[in-house]
């Protein structure tokens, strides 16, 4: 009896692992050099993004967004286009008419320019075929800006130039 139960548990556990949705993005700087990585994991509440990066401005507050196209052409990363906004909202976590699905809290670097943070984005999914899927046609990208997002100014929060980018794979 217990052997059958153990076998059933093993099968169910294997199935749940196989069904877990996760992906990653390699983060590159304006020279195209890899400076970090983000792991993206689907949860019941949205997508958990675990970001680790280095060689960013030290002791800085920096905007961190999901952009609408999966391209990261240095040095300016304009190829990633604007913020991911499938629901046509206004920009900003503090905007009553927002936010964009790609809007996320600012990140903070340490005195050496390193960041290690986890951000839950409840507005996006890794499930294919959904309007807010990061796997939409053309893909999406994670972008780090050189300044903080003010959480309200349209279209991008006065966050400054794009200093790092990673295509969601």
Swiss-Prot record:
For this chain, the annotated S-S bridges are 72-165
- The positions annotated for binding Cu cation are 65, 67, 83, 145
Transmembrane residues, as ranges?
A: none
EC number per UniProt? 1.15.1.1
Q: Which domain of life is it from?
A: Bacteria
Q: Name one Pfam family in it.
A: Sod_Cu
Instruction: Please give the family membership noted in the entry.
Output: Belongs to the Cu-Zn superoxide dismutase family.
Name of the molecule in the record:
Superoxide dismutase [Cu-Zn] 1
Organism listed in the record: Aquifex aeolicus (strain VF5)
What's the encoding gene here? Answer: sodC1
């Amino acid at each position: 009896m217990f052997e059958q139960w153990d076998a059933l548990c093993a099968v169910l556990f294997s199935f749940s692992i196989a069904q877990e949705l996760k992906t990653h993005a390699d983060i590159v700087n304006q020279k195209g050099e890899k400076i970090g990585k983000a792991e993206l994991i689907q949860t019941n509440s949205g997508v958990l993004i675990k970001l680790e990066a280095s060689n960013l401005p030290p002791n800085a507050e920096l905007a961190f967004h999901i952009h609408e196209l999966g391209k990261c052409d240095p040095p300016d990363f304009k190829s990633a286009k604007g913020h991911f906004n499938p629901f046509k909202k206004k920009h900003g976590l503090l905007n009553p008419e927002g936010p964009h699905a790609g809007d996320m809290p600012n990140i903070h670097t340490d005195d050496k320019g390193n960041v290690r943070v986890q951000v839950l984005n409840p507005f996006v999914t890794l499930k294919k075929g959904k309007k807010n899927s990061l796997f939409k046609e053309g893909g999406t990208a994670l972008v780090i800006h050189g300044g903080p997002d003010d959480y309200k100014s349209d279209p991008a929060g006065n966050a400054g130039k794009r200093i790092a980018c990673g295509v969601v794979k």
